[in-house]
């Protein structure tokens, strides 16, 4: 039996795993944060204040117990959410929510590289397949960050329905710098696989959304 698309599928998966490796420290922090707080609250449960009235102790224990339960539920929910990075469950996300999530995930990359992104103030609404679109948006951003010189700013524009644009400053990164984490070719690979299209010009990289996913009205 022949599988003509298998090499392309494997290539897409390979790029997705590269991206996951880049954002995993942030995801790990999201998982460990609630669990660490729950451990602290559990330790406080074992250290009751001396001489406190019985009613106050009972209320304190109940409050801390509720906190532990809530934190554990949050941690479990975050762990389950990691599955959405490994397989497509068919979930959709609004364009604004997707870009906001990407903003959080690339924050450390920007901080360490001394680069900044001017995020769009208005975003044309679109409901996007979360799995493929999130990987594509992250690939686009990570590749663009590599194109920036230190202390440079990238400007994103998502106000026009059907297209996201990234405008690069005049000065690019030093050609002798480290190779990009994600290459433009890999961004194009993910775009084609997800039904998008990337267009690169000297100072502007544009991602064209699949036409059936755009709606038209601007969101703040």
Task: List where the protein language model places each region.
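Conserved ATP-binding N-box helix of the HATPase_c
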Residues: 21-44, 48, 127-156, 180-193
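Short C-terminal beta-strand
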Residues: 167, 203-218
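Glycine-rich/acidic phosphate-handling loop/turn and adjacent ATP-lid/helix
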Residues: 158-190, 216-219
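Conserved catalytic submotifs in the C-terminal HATPase_c
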Residues: 116-128, 159
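Histidine phosphotransfer helical core of two-component systems
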Residues: 2-5, 9-12, 16-23, 31, ...
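Glycine-rich ATP-binding loops of the HATPase_c
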Residues: 194-205
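Conserved DHp (HisKA) dimerization/phosphotransfer helix of two-component histidine kinases, i.e.
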Residues: 59-116
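Beta-strand-enriched, solvent-exposed domains that form extended recognition/catalytic surfaces
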Residues: 193-194, 213
């Amino acid at each position: 039996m022949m599988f003509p698309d298998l090499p392309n599928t494997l290539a897409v998966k390979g790029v997705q795993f590269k991206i996951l490796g880049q954002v995993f420290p942030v995801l790990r922090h999201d998982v460990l944060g609630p669990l660490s707080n729950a451990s602290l609250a559990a330790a406080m449960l074992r250290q009751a204040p001396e001489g406190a009235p019985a009613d106050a102790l009972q209320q304190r224990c109940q409050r801390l117990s509720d906190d532990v339960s809530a934190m554990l539920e949050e941690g479990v929910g975050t762990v389950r959410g990691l599955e959405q990075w490994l397989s497509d469950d068919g979930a959709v996300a609004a364009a604004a929510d997707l870009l906001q999530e990407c903003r959080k995930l690339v924050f450390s990359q920007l901080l360490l590289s001394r680069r900044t992104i001017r995020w769009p103030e208005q975003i044309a609404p679109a409901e996007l397949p979360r799995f493929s679109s999130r990987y594509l948006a992250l690939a686009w951003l990570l590749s663009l960050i590599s194109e920036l010189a230190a202390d440079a700013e990238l400007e994103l524009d998502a106000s026009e329905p059907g297209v996201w644009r990234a405008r690069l400053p005049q000065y690019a990164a030093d050609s002798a710098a480290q190779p990009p984490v994600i290459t433009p070719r890999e961004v194009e690979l993910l775009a084609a696989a997800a039904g998008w299209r990337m267009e690169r010009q000297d100072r502007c990289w544009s991602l064209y959304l699949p036409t059936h996913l755009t709606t038209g009205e601007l969101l703040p």
